[in-house]
């Protein structure tokens, strides 16, 4: 009877240990993609958006002039592509 109790205890302890190891491994796997994506999409100082003197496509053109290739829409006050049907 003593051997049966010891065997059950060791089996239970082994299952608990297996659960802990699997849980730790799974949590590391969940963190890995997050770390990889954050390193890939990290904002670098070289790639920050620069402040322009002109407004780009679909930007407000009330105070800024539109960049070359765009015109200020008289109706919406946005920089849009020039087209013959626009007034």
UniProtKB/Swiss-Prot annotation:
One of its GO terms (molecular function) is toxin activity. It is found in: Secreted. Pfam families: Toxin_12 (PF07740). Expressed by the venom gland. Disulfide bonds join 54-67, 61-72, 66-79. Ion channel inhibitor. This is U3-theraphotoxin-Hhn1a 19. The lineage of its organism: Eukaryota, Metazoa, Ecdysozoa, Arthropoda, Chelicerata.
